[in-house]
Amino acid sequence: MKSKTIKKDDNNNNNDILAKFNNKYHTEINSNTFILDISQKDLDNEGLLLLSEVPLNLFDNVIELNLSQNCISDISPLIIMNFTNLKNINISKNRIENIDAFEKINLYVLETLDLSYNKLKNINSLVKINFANLITLNLANNRINDINALEFMNCPNLRSIDLFNNEILDISVFERINFPQLIQISFAGNYFNHEIIKNHDIISNLRKKGCNVNIYGTIKQIL
């Protein structure tokens, strides 16, 4: 198969796109960027789409992506940005309702995923992802009412999961999960009766396994 020839005009166009993005959002993104921090920039769906139009190899070295505190509701442009080495993703404090795009992104080396303060109602899309190295999962302050998908998630190294302040009624899935490294969970701020559940067998069994279960507050992130 013939390799694609990159014309001078293509390079100029790519540079123009990147310059346009950097100027608009006051960033300094270049080919040496390891931490892609575009937090608190009023970045919206249109801006994220613009960023996805820059050269694919621009993101080869990125290990941390921070898009927190913006106005994003659609993360599908991330699919074509060719991230291969991401260890940390923070998309907290946006307007995200759908995370199906994560199914098509290489998250094999990912260690931290922060989706807190969004509008998620379920986490079903996460079942299809191989989170072989995920350590911390923050789902706090969403609208999640069903967490049964946790039973089918592949997270052999998951140590912390924050479900603080959602709409969860049933935590029976924690009788069936297989997270051998899990050491802390927060269920606080959900729709069940916390006084009743604090002595529930599920909570007791998790604690017997060495897991710190918090039913009254959020938890400190491990990473």
Please describe what each predicted stretch is.
Residues 111-153:
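Eukaryotic tandem repeat interaction scaffolds
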Residues 2-6, 33, 180-223:
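C-terminal capping region of solenoid repeat domains
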Residues 49-58, 77-83, 100-107, 124-131, ...:
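A structural signal for leucine-rich repeat
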Residues 15, 24-77:
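LRR N-terminal entry segment and analogous cap-like coil->beta motifs
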Residues 41, 70, 94, 118, ...:
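Conserved "Asn-ladder"/turn position within leucine-rich repeats
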